[in-house]
Regions:
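Enzymes that bind and transform nitrogen-containing heteroaromatic metabolites
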Residues: 1-116
Length: 116
């Protein structure tokens, strides 16, 4: 999901798998983007999706209760670039330490993390 579009030389376009990019040609950003995205996914018979969006996209999915699982990496390092993620006001179901970082798992609708 991108208002500006993505450069064609990004690695996601390396032909290893199907990639769907939604931009302002497919999505009206002045309307409910979650409904529009879900309608597009349903039309394309896509049953599972990973949303790696910016704060606005992620917050819209969380606030619409249209999510099953959230994974958040937390670090003590100061990250100077990037976009701040949404503020999750839930208790993590599981936390795993990976080197000097913490991976937090949140679930909705009874999803479990037994495979981790």
């Amino acid at each position: 999901l991108s208002k500006k579009g993505l450069k064609k030389d990004y690695k996601i376009f390396n032909q290893d798998s199907k990639v769907t990019v939604l931009n302002d040609k497919e999505i009206d950003f002045d309307k409910n983007i979650v409904t529009q995205i879900c309608d597009k996914l349903y039309h394309d018979k896509i049953l599972s999706v990973i949303i790696e969006g910016g704060n606005k996209t992620l917050s819209n999915f969380i606030n619409s209760n249209m999510w099953d699982e959230i994974r958040i990496f937390k670090t003590q390092e100061i990250l100077r670039d990037g976009i701040k993620g949404p503020n999750i006001k839930l208790k993590a179901k599981r936390k795993i330490e990976i080197e000097n970082n913490i991976l937090e798992y949140y679930s909705n609708n009874g999803v479990t993390f037994s495979s981790i």
